[in-house]
Curated annotation (Swiss-Prot):
Domain of life: Archaea
Protein name per UniProt: Uncharacterized protein AF_1717
Family: To B.subtilis YrhD.
Length: 140
């Protein structure tokens, strides 16, 4: 085990300076660092990193160009995931849950469909879908 006396004053000074520089960077960027940590925790809780590990074990021969293209697309996907607002992720999760619950359904005629339009939940979903369609239409 090394003791403090084993380290030369010059090396100790350089180490202290390096630690101070790191500390300054942390202080300057603490909001961004905390935000990045929060996003990493979200990705971890959602199992994204486990999937990345599984993907790394995938044994398919790719050309260097294919690997570069996959890496670029994966980087873009990560940037998109990190830029998505938490509220959007929650809406997507609820959409997936609703989709799973809707896998068992009964056939419905025109009259039943018209009656269903009176349901506040159906009206809320239609309002959301129409707003989404309008906003999406502006961007295509």
């Amino acid at each position: 085990m090394r003791r403090m006396t084993d380290i030369s004053p010059d090396k100790f000074a350089k180490a202290a300076e390096a630690i101070y520089e790191i500390f300054e960077k942390v202080v300057e960027n603490h909001d961004e660092i905390l935000d990045a940590i929060d996003k990493l925790l979200i990705l971890e809780r959602k199992g994204v990193f486990d999937e990345i590990v599984k993907f790394s074990e995938f044994k398919v021969p790719f050309t260097p160009d294919e690997i570069r293209e996959i890496a670029e697309r994966f980087e873009m996907l990560i940037k998109i995931l990190l830029s998505v607002d938490e509220r959007v992720l929650k809406v997507i999760k609820r959409l997936i849950d609703a989709f799973e619950e809707s896998m068992v359904y009964e056939q419905m005629g025109m009259m039943e469909a018209m009656k269903a339009l009176r349901d506040p939940d159906v009206q809320k979903a239609i309002g959301f879908a129409l707003t989404l369609a309008k906003n999406f239409g502006k961007r295509i």
